[in-house]
Amino acid sequence: MSIIKNDTIIKAYQGEETDYTPAWFMRQAGRSQPEYRALKEKYSLFEITHQPELCAYVTRLPVENYGTDAAILYKDIMSPLPYIGVDVEIKSGIGPVIHNPIRNLQDVEKLGVINPVSDVPYVLDTIRLLTEEQLEVPLIGFSGAPFTLASYMIEGGPSKNYSKTKALMYREPETWFALMDKLSDMIISYVDAQVEAGAKAIQIFDSWVGSLNAEDYRVFIKPVMTRIFSELRRHEVPLITFGVGARHLLMEWNDLPVDVIGLDWRTSINEAREMGVTKVVQGNLDPAILLSDWQTIEQRTKQILDQGMQSGKHVFNLGHGVTPDIEPATLKKLTELVHNYSKQK
């Protein structure tokens, strides 16, 4: 049974008018919080994410400490991959490293199928614990998108130019679309289970898809994303898409069956609207600005809020994730600024 007392963000995601602009921050849970760093001295990342009590604690901390209007599940986008046969290791200072990278169709055909109930019960238990007992604001579930996940699986880890990924996509389209189908099946099952456990909105992170041009996106990715979001629509929860450096793809996203488009810091709300974006937009303060002086933070935040309130249909967020060097006190002050300033308008 849900114990939500503040559903402002859901109303905003649905395009309804709200009393103020709701706010949350990508990567709000975790590295920037002293409580989390203290926890990491006792437990590994694996232990935190696999113990519902610990994971729920980390997930809800930003709501308690900053006053955000939503929590986002504390997990990594790589979390479901081991259950379809991907040998992934999160290496400190590097990121995800794949020990069995995809090289051909045979590698794709070896991938299995995820069963969230038996494979990731700790994820679902965390969601239920939060939504039934602990959170009075909505919980956002999430998944990585096929292109972004595939880029790690093909490159073998993080990449600057995604040359191996693009080469396989161009050279072996049959292999590419077979991989897209496998990942789409996994994402749909994984997200289905999150919503059924209690998640009230879903964000799909397509972090690196901006490396594709618009034509390649239309051919190799858009049909895949259309299928995923179309199938997830049956849950009647808000669906959000987000990527970095993807200004040239905004109108492609506007065609997708999503409710919300996340903007990174490079494209203003006004620019997105001038391009023709009609969906609810989420964003988009540059995280680096939060390392500046308060006068600059306040000025830039109000500018974003003014544009959001002028055009309507806006949820405040950063243009990328919270970095470890951002002070928790700054995030609390920022949340208060967003709420108070937008209430006065």
Swiss-Prot record:
One of its GO terms (cellular component) is cytosol. Its EC number is 4.1.1.37. Pathway: Porphyrin-containing compound metabolism; protoporphyrin-IX biosynthesis; coproporphyrinogen-III from 5-aminolevulinate: step 4/4. GO terms for biological process: protoporphyrinogen IX biosynthetic process. The record marks 76 as: Transition state stabilizer. InterPro entries: UROD/MetE-like_sf, Uroporphyrinogen_deCO2ase_HemE, Uroporphyrinogen_deCOase. SUPFAM superfamilies: UROD/MetE-like (SSF51726). Homodimer. Belongs to the uroporphyrinogen decarboxylase family. HAMAP family: URO_D. Catalyzes the decarboxylation of four acetate groups of uroporphyrinogen-III to yield coproporphyrinogen-III. This is Uroporphyrinogen decarboxylase. It comes from Oceanobacillus iheyensis (strain DSM 14371 / CIP 107618 / JCM 11309 / KCTC 3954 / HTE831). The gene is hemE.
